[in-house]
Amino acid sequence: VRGLAWVTVGSMAANLCSYLVHLPASRWLGPAAYGEFASLLQLVLVLAVPALALQTVVARQVVRGAGAAQMRALGYRIALGAGVLAAVAVPIAAAGLHTRAGTAAAALAAAPALVLLAVEQGLLQGERRFGRLAALLGIAGAGKLVFTVPGLLLGPGPALLGTTVGALVAAAVGRALAGDPAGTGTAPDAGVRAVLGASSVQLVLAVFASLDLLLSRPVLGAAAAGTYALGAVAAKVAFWLPQAVGVVFYPQLATPDRARGALRTVVGLLTALGLACVAGAAVCAPLATMLAGEEYRPVQGLLWLFAAQGALLALLQGLLLYAIAIERTRMALFAWAVVAVEAAILLTLPHTPAEMITAAALCALAAVMVVGAVVTVSARRASGSRSPRSATRPASAGH
């Protein structure tokens, strides 16, 4: 419980810093430039998939006895790959998002830096040093705020470059916090292939969390996309606020005789927090125009729906973390099928922000239902393959 509290505080601090970036950005850049800025930030989330995957693999391997040197060596290889992927993606992103190549490059430069940060977070997570992990999360969020906001005065490109600097500073601090634990040496080797498997899961989550915002600019136009981007902040809050649940319970999900009980706890907590986020968005909706300006009024009444989408994606994330923990990443194929349907729908049907978020939320609900059914069947089969005593042993919630 104490670990959950620590990571919740750290995650909330990091998320608060991220959202504070959006307030001056929406005012100083204007709807059109802010839409460009927000879309590129979402693209960074997609290219941060190797980092997210690496953190889960590092945490899982540390639970099984891996040491820091082994995991950092893996991290350097993944960072190199992320840098190459980011370089290749620059012209594609510039053309697809109707932005300049320099601005796209400034955004995508964050990808390898986030990988280096993820190694240290994974080490702390796997060792259950949640107090230090919470501190690192807060430092990473503060770095993003401190280095990004001044850049807004110069435009989207310099601001986006600030996210890279913030991530590099946080990675250096994270190395000091994590130290050099040797591990037990009993963990099976996990190489790039393991990270690629986890990446398939994290990528589908990133695409789900980003697809509607990435497509809003070409589908709705620059001005409407800027309005939509502000509403998407509510989705981000609902998606990232419960992040601590997955972080704290992931080591238990990776422990066979605790996995099923931990899964039930994760689903219950994410559902409760999601409902709270939807209610909070409905109550706080009038603050949107007060904080961001009257030009964003069209999205005010939709904030609860954005929050519902984010809450559903948080629940989907919890289900797919179970897939990574038990090394059954092929479950992500079911989510990919829903993503393909969502892309087709968003490119053809919506003409307004209301229509786009409605379609995106319904697709998120469909993904939760499909993946939830697959995970339930898998958990029951795994339970049946163990002894009744070990299968029904209650999970300890981070005591």
Where are these regions (language model features)?
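Small-residue hotspots at the loop-to-helix junctions and early N-terminal turns
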Residues: A32-Q42, A104, A222-V233, Q300-L303
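Membrane-interface junctions at transmembrane-helix termini in multi-pass inner-membrane proteins
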Residues: V62, L114-A135, T255, A308-A335
